[in-house]
């Protein structure tokens, strides 16, 4: 279990995440297939294992892991629009009258309902790790929308979930730009060979660089003309590499081989033990990494009451 992306959410109040109570809460909204006339369903699934006996909360030391699954029927808008257009033309030709918006919308609804049972189904899973002592929920996603879907559903079953995205005192853009401009990152961090530069003007240009020396004259020239760094490839110690963006989203997260090898040794041959060992080691790494990252970005803005 290694996250590939990371969104960090800060609990604004202390929440007693008791595994048994959380298990019962998640069980009140299990994932299920879409019915024939449903566009989408959303619910919780076991993060590891299958079957009714698989727990919805994976507990490893002080850390908890949960997962949710979304199932949706895929109706391409072009297919629906073509069918609506065809039906409208048929009515206007046969009945010699104009079809107005209200009737057109009704026709569209009827066509969607007719197409739904035959639509393809897409399933997607999302994981979230809860670290009560650290006061954070970590979501394995680069999409704030997908993360908010999970958190709002978790809030629904728990009754309350005081949480907000983690923020820092200095805009990540300013820090990343300074690191590239000065050719030196904060202690323990290393600038790699990929970045995105944007002009600060609303319609300004965008430059994306891959496999390029970011200390070179070309990059420095872009910075001198007013562009800022909005995405930056970084490494931390000998443990992680990732892309950090201007919204504090961590993408393309990669755990270095030494960590993965350690998890394999700790986990042994059983799949369940391997899963638990990698999750535990990942969370211990995050517990060390996130405070250092926040400090490098000017320090975290801690909500009152935490």
From Swiss-Prot:
It is found in: Cytoplasm, Nucleoid. Keywords: Cytoplasm, DNA recombination. GO terms for molecular function: double-stranded DNA binding. PANTHER family: RECOMBINATION-ASSOCIATED PROTEIN RDGC. NCBIfam families: PRK00321.1-2 (NF001461), PRK00321.1-3 (NF001462), PRK00321.1-5 (NF001464). May be involved in recombination. This is Recombination-associated protein RdgC.
């Amino acid at each position: 279990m290694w996250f590939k992306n990371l969104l960090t959410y800060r609990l604004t109040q202390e929440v007693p995440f008791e595994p048994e109570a959380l298990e019962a809460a998640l069980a009140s909204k299990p994932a299920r297939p879409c019915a024939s006339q449903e566009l989408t369903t959303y619910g919780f699934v076991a993060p590891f294992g299958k079957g009714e006996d698989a727990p919805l909360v994976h507990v490893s030391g002080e850390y908890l892991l949960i997962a949710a699954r979304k199932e949706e029927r895929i109706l391409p808008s072009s297919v629906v629009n073509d069918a609506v257009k065809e039906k409208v033309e048929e009515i206007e030709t046969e009945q010699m009258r104009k079809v107005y918006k209200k009737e057109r919308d009704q026709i569209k609804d009827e066509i969607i309902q007719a197409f739904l049972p035959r639509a393809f189904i897409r399933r997607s899973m999302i994981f979230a790790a809860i670290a009560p002592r650290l006061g954070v929920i970590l979501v394995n996603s680069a999409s704030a929308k997908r993360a908010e879907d999970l958190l709002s559903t978790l809030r629904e079953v728990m009754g309350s979930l005081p949480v907000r995205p983690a923020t820092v005192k200095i805009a990540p853009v300013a820090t990343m730009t300074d690191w590239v401009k000065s050719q030196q990152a904060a202690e323990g961090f290393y600038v790699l060979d990929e970045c995105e530069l944007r002009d600060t003007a609303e319609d300004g240009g965008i430059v994306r660089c891959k496999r390029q020396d970011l200390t070179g004259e070309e990059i420095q020239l872009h910075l001198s003309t007013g562009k800022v760094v909005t995405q930056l490839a970084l490494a931390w110690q000998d443990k992680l590499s990732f892309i950090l963006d201007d919204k504090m989203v961590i993408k393309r997260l990669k755990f270095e081989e030494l960590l993965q090898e350690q998890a394999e040794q700790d986990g042994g041959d059983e799949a369940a033990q391997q899963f638990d060992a990698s999750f535990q080691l990942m969370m211990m790494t995050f517990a060390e990494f996130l405070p250092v990252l926040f400090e490098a970005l000017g320090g975290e803005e801690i909500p009152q009451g935490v």
